[in-house]
Amino acid sequence: MTVALCYGLPAVWQADAQILILGSLPGVTSLRAAQYYAHPRNQFWPLLQQLAGINASLRYEDRIAALKQQRLALWDLIGAAERRGSLDSAITPASIQLNDFSVLLQQLPALRAVWLNGGTAAKAWQKLNKAGLTLPAAVQVFALPSSSPAHAALSFADKLQYWRQAYQQTLTTNTGE
């Protein structure tokens, strides 16, 4: 049985973004809503509420505006892939088509950090690096635990600790500007 390709969402960014948060591929709920991290149990927006004061209960459009105001950008490493359901483990590896980051990275001159949201994102990032993607030396890369509800190995508090550490290290690096 053939599985249709799932296509990701467009990048959410602005030229002054300092942090680019990269997921793997949006789940079914997010794709249907055309919204990043739309699943009600995904902890992404609650994590950003704790880190950057972005109210997780705002309408999606308002959360995106607040995200941009905080100089954060969003995208996914996988632009398209075959997948049954929403789990990253259901992605057919041979079908993965990575997004082209070369153009986006040129549009982000203030970029200071790339945050990889979960293990699948980290693996896809490694593939991009092997394919020749290069970042300016000042850009830090953080592999973070997934905000997905499927990643239950860590509690919200534990995930928040990792995400907060990345946030603080990114801010500390930027204090010299």
Describe the residue ranges of each PLM region.
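Short, surface-exposed acidic-centric catalytic microdomains
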Residues: 29-92
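C-terminal capping/extension of enzyme domains
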Residues: 1-11, 39-40, 87-102, 126-177
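A general structural motif
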Residues: 16-17, 110-112, 138
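Short, solvent-exposed loop/turn segments at secondary-structure junctions
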Residues: 26-29, 43, 79-83, 119-123, ...
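Internal catalytic-core helix/loop-beta-alpha segment
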Residues: 69-124
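Short, hydrophobic/glycine-enriched beta-strand segments
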Residues: 18-24
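Hydrophobic packing residues within well-ordered alpha-helices of enzyme cores
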Residues: 48, 124-125
